[in-house]
Amino acid sequence: MAEKVLTRYTGKGAPTVTANRVIRASAAITTDGEYTDEIPVAGFERLTLTIDYAKNSETTWRLYMLHSPDEGVTWHWMLNVGAADSGGASAVVKAYDKFTPSDFAASDHVSIDIDVKAKQRVKFFVQAVGSGPFGLVGIGAQAGVSPVAI
């Protein structure tokens, strides 16, 4: 079965599609150091988020993710969740993942695979820690029905 792909990216101009099919684009984060996006993921099994980091940047970033089963339904935290209870709810261990300049020392980007089975919508936002200028950061997303090598 061919992989279904959904892409959503920030920035100006066309995104760069790498050989491993992760979508990346360069984008200037807004003056308040935040970016938010919402992605419909119904029918997909996993979501890969990729963050490109500005070279020589000293900014630390926090990535928050939430999911919602349907329109108008409460958003729930999604990163680093504990085991689901009988009602399907999960305990949040940590509400965000933090990326520091040292995380990007050996690579241009960091990718995160997230299980999105049975979820309808995913919302994520990236927040800079501290004051600007924040430089450039790229945020890419790909959803599919089977894992890909990254």
Name these PLM-found stretches.
Residues A2-R21, I29, D52-N56, H67, ...:
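C-terminal interaction-tip segments
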Residues P15-P40, A54-T60, D70-V73, G87-A89, ...:
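Surface-exposed ligand/attachment interfaces on beta-rich extracellular proteins
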Residues E34-A42, W77-S146:
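Beta-sandwich interaction modules
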Residues E45-L49:
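Structural beta-strand segments of beta-rich domains
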Residues T59-L79, V137-I139:
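Short, surface-exposed beta-strand/strand-loop-strand elements in extracellular ectodomains
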